[in-house]
Amino acid sequence: MDLDTASHMLTATVRTETVPMARVPWNEPGIIGRVLDAGALAVVIPMVNTADEARQAVESCRYSPVGSRSFGPSLPNNRYGSMYPVRANDEIAVIPMIETREALANLDEIVSVPGVDAVYIGPADLSIALGLPPGMDHEAAVFNDALEAVVAACHRHGVVPGVHANPSIAAKRYEQGFRMITVGYEIFAAQTALRGDGKAARAAIADAI
């Protein structure tokens, strides 16, 4: 979705108990600033491959003196008042994505960057980087060794390991040590609902014949 749509969705959460999280399209300060100004409390940043790129992501999410974020969040101010800059620096979660061989090679450096709260594996991109078909799960040792390496690095540095999954493998990922597990997205949810509705309709018609 585009930034305007994402901003409207984030705005809708401001007076709720929801903790809004946004995945931005790239590690770019202006894009990150827009979703934060709209009310995001966690930002997932794709294709972070080095410690320097992780530091850039953190700085984009933090106000001075620990970052370079520009002040302009009228909506978060409505929720948190004049203390928003202080609370934002303390509470907004910065979540780089691990999706490449380069990121795997730099794991310890990435997760040890101050301000990185979690990392999040994009399994499809990681699969491709490892020479596998895009997917959420593989039997190949190279894929499972990579997952294990991410969990181990996170545990060494007190960072939350995260991964995208689906309902059928969520328990498996939890057993592997992941503690932030997503199990769907809007297109997947719509497809699942439509399949269920179609199945129910066909069953009802069959019963009526």
How does the language model describe each region?
Residues 1-209:
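Expand to "…catalyze enediolate/carbanion chemistry for C-C bond making/breaking, isomerization
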